[in-house]
């Protein structure tokens, strides 16, 4: 029971770090990056589908992204979805492909994006701490019910604390890396 609780908690913490990694990747830096389009979806035959599954996305230059839809009729919906997203870019459609020029970030916009990155990192750390709290409650219940000895539960709690620290450190590293990317001119 203890091993299951620890395994389940670690799995959830890993997922929280993965979500944080995806969230941080969706924040645009001053450079072109295909990952910035991961969160943009369009309605494709009644299903909300990411544009990354409906087109090829290439970065021919540092500040230019070229999006080529697999189906020509998806050109307009993809262009509209990008324009309406929170990326702050203006796509141009030449009939076959969509070109997205990535404008230089202003100092104020960089600071806002750093705040946004820190906020997403803090959300992930709160999620990890909540997972830890629930696992600790489960370990206390196991101890109370007599399903495991006190030494085993104490050892499991220390392992859980170690895992919590490890995953929160990973989130801190991700945020620090993103902050460096954003502040780099």
From Swiss-Prot:
Which portions of the chain have biased composition (kind: Basic and acidic residues)? Answer: 142-164
GO cellular component terms, semicolon-separated: cytoplasm
Q: Where is this region: Disordered?
A: 142-173
Q: Which InterPro entries match?
A: Ribosome_recyc_fac, Ribosome_recyc_fac_dom, RRF_sf
> In which broad location class does this protein mainly occur, judging by the first location in its UniProt entry?
cytoplasm
User: What is the recorded function of this protein according to its Swiss-Prot or TrEMBL entry?
Assistant: Responsible for the release of ribosomes from messenger RNA at the termination of protein biosynthesis. May increase the efficiency of translation by recycling ribosomes from one round of translation to another.
For this entry, the protein name equals: Ribosome-recycling factor
Species this protein is from: Mycolicibacterium gilvum (strain PYR-GCK)
Q: What lineage is on file?
A: Bacteria, Bacillati, Actinomycetota, Actinomycetes, Mycobacteriales
